[in-house]
Amino acid sequence: MNKLRKLKRDTDHRQALMRNLATSLFKHGRIMTTEAKAKDLRRIAEKLITIAKKGDLASYRRVLGYLYEEDVAYDLFQKIAPRYQGRNGGYTRIIKVGPRKGDGAMMVYIELV
Protein backbone atom coordinates (compact mmCIF):
# COMPACT_ATOMS: atom_id res chain seq x y z
CA MET A 1 0.00 0.00 0.00
CA ASN A 2 1.29 3.44 -0.88
CA LYS A 3 1.77 5.83 2.01
CA LEU A 4 1.10 9.51 2.25
CA ARG A 5 3.74 11.93 3.49
CA LYS A 6 4.02 12.47 7.23
CA LEU A 7 4.19 16.28 6.89
CA LYS A 8 5.86 16.48 10.35
CA ARG A 9 2.57 15.72 12.09
CA ASP A 10 1.25 12.81 14.10
CA THR A 11 -1.39 10.56 12.56
CA ASP A 12 -4.49 12.26 13.97
CA HIS A 13 -3.27 15.75 13.10
CA ARG A 14 -2.36 14.68 9.56
CA GLN A 15 -5.74 13.02 8.98
CA ALA A 16 -7.58 16.09 10.30
CA LEU A 17 -5.46 18.31 8.03
CA MET A 18 -6.33 16.25 4.95
CA ARG A 19 -10.03 16.19 5.89
CA ASN A 20 -10.00 19.98 6.28
CA LEU A 21 -8.16 20.49 2.98
CA ALA A 22 -10.52 18.14 1.13
CA THR A 23 -13.57 19.89 2.58
CA SER A 24 -12.17 23.28 1.57
CA LEU A 25 -11.29 22.09 -1.93
CA PHE A 26 -14.80 20.79 -2.60
CA LYS A 27 -16.36 23.87 -0.99
CA HIS A 28 -14.34 26.48 -2.90
CA GLY A 29 -13.14 24.58 -5.98
CA ARG A 30 -9.61 25.96 -5.63
CA ILE A 31 -7.28 26.41 -2.66
CA MET A 32 -3.69 27.51 -2.12
CA THR A 33 -1.42 25.28 -0.07
CA THR A 34 2.11 23.88 -0.10
CA GLU A 35 3.18 21.51 -2.84
CA ALA A 36 3.62 18.51 -0.52
CA LYS A 37 0.15 18.94 1.01
CA ALA A 38 -1.40 19.40 -2.44
CA LYS A 39 0.14 16.19 -3.76
CA ASP A 40 -1.28 14.21 -0.83
CA LEU A 41 -4.63 15.99 -1.11
CA ARG A 42 -4.85 15.14 -4.81
CA ARG A 43 -4.87 11.39 -4.06
CA ILE A 44 -7.57 11.75 -1.42
CA ALA A 45 -9.77 14.13 -3.46
CA GLU A 46 -9.66 11.92 -6.52
CA LYS A 47 -10.65 8.86 -4.48
CA LEU A 48 -13.56 10.77 -2.93
CA ILE A 49 -14.80 11.92 -6.35
CA THR A 50 -14.55 8.36 -7.69
CA ILE A 51 -16.60 7.11 -4.73
CA ALA A 52 -19.14 9.91 -5.26
CA LYS A 53 -19.56 8.99 -8.94
CA LYS A 54 -21.26 5.74 -7.86
CA GLY A 55 -24.04 7.84 -6.35
CA ASP A 56 -25.51 5.20 -4.01
CA LEU A 57 -26.37 5.60 -0.34
CA ALA A 58 -23.36 3.64 0.92
CA SER A 59 -21.03 5.90 -1.09
CA TYR A 60 -22.75 9.01 0.27
CA ARG A 61 -22.34 7.81 3.84
CA ARG A 62 -18.69 6.93 3.23
CA VAL A 63 -17.93 10.41 1.86
CA LEU A 64 -20.02 12.04 4.60
CA GLY A 65 -17.86 10.27 7.18
CA TYR A 66 -14.73 11.80 5.69
CA LEU A 67 -15.77 15.39 4.96
CA TYR A 68 -16.51 17.76 7.83
CA GLU A 69 -19.53 19.53 6.30
CA GLU A 70 -22.70 17.79 5.19
CA ASP A 71 -23.56 20.44 2.60
CA VAL A 72 -20.15 19.98 0.97
CA ALA A 73 -20.77 16.23 0.69
CA TYR A 74 -24.18 16.95 -0.83
CA ASP A 75 -22.61 19.33 -3.38
CA LEU A 76 -19.97 16.71 -4.18
CA PHE A 77 -22.69 14.22 -5.12
CA GLN A 78 -25.10 16.63 -6.82
CA LYS A 79 -22.78 19.08 -8.62
CA ILE A 80 -19.14 17.94 -8.71
CA ALA A 81 -19.29 14.17 -9.35
CA PRO A 82 -21.76 14.37 -12.29
CA ARG A 83 -19.28 16.63 -14.15
CA TYR A 84 -16.77 13.77 -14.18
CA GLN A 85 -18.99 10.85 -15.26
CA GLY A 86 -17.12 10.45 -18.55
CA ARG A 87 -13.66 10.90 -17.02
CA ASN A 88 -11.59 8.17 -15.38
CA GLY A 89 -9.40 10.11 -12.96
CA GLY A 90 -7.50 13.35 -13.36
CA TYR A 91 -10.13 15.44 -11.60
CA THR A 92 -7.65 17.90 -10.06
CA ARG A 93 -4.86 20.14 -11.31
CA ILE A 94 -1.88 21.56 -9.42
CA ILE A 95 -0.53 24.96 -10.54
CA LYS A 96 2.74 26.23 -9.05
CA VAL A 97 2.60 29.78 -7.70
CA GLY A 98 6.09 30.29 -6.30
CA PRO A 99 7.92 30.18 -3.00
CA ARG A 100 6.27 31.44 0.19
CA LYS A 101 7.87 34.62 1.47
CA GLY A 102 8.43 33.48 5.05
CA ASP A 103 10.16 30.13 4.62
CA GLY A 104 10.53 29.55 0.88
CA ALA A 105 8.11 26.62 0.76
CA MET A 106 6.74 26.08 -2.76
CA MET A 107 3.11 27.25 -2.85
CA VAL A 108 0.61 25.87 -5.34
CA TYR A 109 -3.04 26.13 -6.27
CA ILE A 110 -4.92 22.85 -6.35
CA GLU A 111 -8.20 23.06 -8.21
CA LEU A 112 -10.92 20.90 -9.66
CA VAL A 113 -10.62 20.57 -13.44
Swiss-Prot record:
It holds the Pfam family Ribosomal_L17. InterPro entries: Ribosomal_bL17, Ribosomal_bL17_CS, Ribosomal_bL17_sf. GO terms for biological process: translation. GO terms for cellular component: cytosolic large ribosomal subunit. The keyword Translocase does not apply. Signal peptide: none annotated. Keywords: Ribonucleoprotein, Ribosomal protein. Part of the 50S ribosomal subunit. Contacts protein L32. This is Large ribosomal subunit protein bL17. It comes from Caldicellulosiruptor bescii (strain ATCC BAA-1888 / DSM 6725 / KCTC 15123 / Z-1320).
